[in-house]
Amino acid sequence: MDQSEIVKLNKIKAKSAWLKKGAARSSAISCGLGIGIGFGIALFIFSQTLRGFGIYLAGLCTFHMWEYIWVTMYHPDKLSSKSFLLNHSPQFNMALLISFIEFWIEWYFFPSLKTFSLWWVGAICMVFGQIVRSVAMDTAGSNFTHLVQEEKRDDHVLVTNGIYQYMRHPSYFGWFVWSVSTQVILMNPISIIGFGWASWSFFSQRIENEEDYLIQFFGKSYKDYKKSVWSGIPGIH
């Protein structure tokens, strides 16, 4: 079966999975995210005090939309409304809530803080992080999953080419940069520190857990790869 036939088959599987696994919910979420992207762009264009928030909102909605699109491309049989990663974890949801509260409190009481010109630095870094994560996911293809795999699939191979030559977990690196950058855009001084610490703690545990399984799956090949290539997260080998 050539590549075009595989893509066509995956499209059929994706459509079937979409119809079976919460088509209405997925449609509603997609619509909501699309509105969020449009509203964010409108704020950036027309608002003087909420331009940063507009970029943040558009970037946040784009992130979740892309996560869903990626699953339709490479894991159509696992497609569901959960593929948007909207309910990633209680910690992630709490961090988002705190960042929103911080932004609006500071916007109301210290409006000058939210018009500080460095928001564009965060925007550039956020786009960079999104691109790195997207490239990593595309390079890994079906070998990349949202959940840590505890059993090796027959088609699971060790990916060390492309961006994986330079870091073992480029998708985590991209997400780490992306998450901290969103708080730079919002000019949330407390959440910048909080997101950095929370993201590092999360990936520290996840990488250790994931690599235990990868060593079981690939043995010496992964051990050698681990020794020679950086993890992608500062302070984590």
Curated annotation (Swiss-Prot):
UniProt topology in membrane: Multi-pass membrane protein
GO BP, one annotated term: regulation of aggregation involved in sorocarp development
GO molecular function: protein C-terminal S-isoprenylcysteine carboxyl O-methyltransferase activity
EC number: 2.1.1.100
Keyword field: Endoplasmic reticulum, Membrane, Methyltransferase, S-adenosyl-L-methionine, Transferase, Transmembrane, Transmembrane helix
Keyword Cytoplasm assigned: no
Disruption phenotype: Cells lacking both icmt-1 and icmt-2 do not propagate cAMP waves in a sustained manner and fail to aggregate, affecting differentiation and development.
Pfam families, A to Z: ICMT (PF04140)
Listed PROSITE patterns: SAM_ICMT
One GO cellular component, as annotated: endoplasmic reticulum
Catalytic activity: [protein]-C-terminal S-[(2E,6E)-farnesyl]-L-cysteine + S-adenosyl-L-methionine = [protein]-C-terminal S-[(2E,6E)-farnesyl]-L-cysteine methyl ester + S-adenosyl-L-homocysteine
Domain of life: Eukaryota
Matching InterPro entries: ICMT_MeTrfase, PPMT_MeTrfase
Bilayer-crossing regions: 26-46, 53-73, 92-112, 116-136, 184-204
Subcellular locations according to the entry: Endoplasmic reticulum membrane
Binding of S-adenosyl-L-methionine, residues: Q149, H156, V157, L158, V159, Y164, H169, P170, S171, Y172, E210
Binding-site residues, substrate: R206
Function of the molecule: Methylates the C-terminal cysteine residues of small GTPases and the heterotrimeric G protein gamma subunit in response to cAMP. The methylation is required for intercellular signaling and regulation of cAMP waves propagation. It also seems to induce the activity of car1, a G protein-coupled receptor which senses extracellular cAMP during the aggregation phase of development.
Family: Belongs to the class VI-like SAM-binding methyltransferase superfamily. Isoprenylcysteine carboxyl methyltransferase family.
Protein name: Protein-S-isoprenylcysteine O-methyltransferase
Record organism: Dictyostelium discoideum (Social amoeba)
Gene: icmt-1
